[in-house]
């Protein structure tokens, strides 16, 4: 249930950087043109050429190292349904994101929309957590180290944007306005250290319960987590998109 931040960072890389002019980026990136009838395949090839460089990062593109991917903080507040809790995750580190497979890209240039399908074989996550609330009517409280392993992850994302004219330059820019994501995790294993003030009996029982019911828990938390990641994604991506005109990011 902690995978979305990692996934959307990679979606940002895919959609935001693969088509910047060569004079502004390293030569290993392929330029894609929006009038290319094979634009979707071009983007896929661009991503493949970028993949080896993601592990260590690309300073010239302001892409940080992605192995591990570091996310400073995520907060989740859920008050409706069978899960009612507040949780905070800090110092998040995720391994395995650069092993993603971009299965398909479908661009709709006229409507400023991109649809992506990805597959992630495995993600491993470590973070400091703080949680307090109830899960399926059972109380849960604790803070400490959270660890998670997620495998066979299928992701579908639809990123919606719009064009606007810069008041400073008069040039046309692009910004993300919304996105939809649906992900399916084949299997998950999570462990929260120091639950219930270190009571090993209660802690072991809760971790067993979470792993036995991880699909139910993930389904309940998913909307709140998606909203959180959506705002992070839009804020971060638009800071980057605002620097380049559309004709630079995706020339005709």
Regions picked out by a protein language model, each given a short descriptive name:
Residues 170-226:
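Extended amphipathic ligand-handling, pore-lining, and cofactor/metal-binding catalytic surfaces
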Residues 46-54, 58, 210-214, 218, ...:
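Sec/Tat-exported extracytoplasmic proteins
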């Amino acid at each position: 249930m902690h995978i979305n931040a990692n996934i959307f960072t990679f979606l940002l890389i895919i959609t935001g950087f693969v088509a910047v002019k060569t004079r502004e980026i390293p030569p290993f990136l392929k330029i894609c043109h929006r009038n290319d009838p094979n634009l979707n395949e071009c983007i896929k090839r661009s991503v493949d050429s970028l993949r080896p460089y993601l592990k260590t990062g690309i300073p010239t593109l302001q892409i940080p190292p992605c192995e591990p991917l570091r996310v400073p903080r995520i907060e989740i507040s859920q008050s409706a349904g069978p899960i009612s809790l507040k949780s905070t995750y800090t110092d998040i580190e995720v391994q395995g994101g650069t092993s993603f497979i971009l299965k398909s890209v479908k661009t709709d240039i006229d409507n400023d929309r991109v649809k992506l399908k990805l597959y992630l074989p495995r993600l491993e996550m470590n973070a400091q957590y703080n949680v307090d609330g109830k899960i399926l009517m059972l109380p849960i409280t604790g803070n400490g180290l959270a660890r998670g392993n997620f495998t066979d992850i299928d992701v579908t994302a639809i990123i919606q944007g719009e064009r606007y004219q810069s008041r400073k330059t008069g040039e046309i820019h692009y910004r993300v306005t919304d996105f939809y994501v649906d992900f399916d995790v084949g299997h998950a294993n999570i462990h929260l250290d120091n639950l219930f003030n270190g009571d090993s009996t209660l802690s072991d029982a809760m971790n067993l319960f979470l792993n036995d019911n991880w699909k139910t828990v993930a389904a309940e938390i998913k909307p709140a987590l998606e909203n959180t990641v959506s705002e992070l994604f839009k804020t971060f991506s638009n800071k980057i998109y605002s620097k380049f005109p559309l004709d630079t990011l995706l020339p005709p």
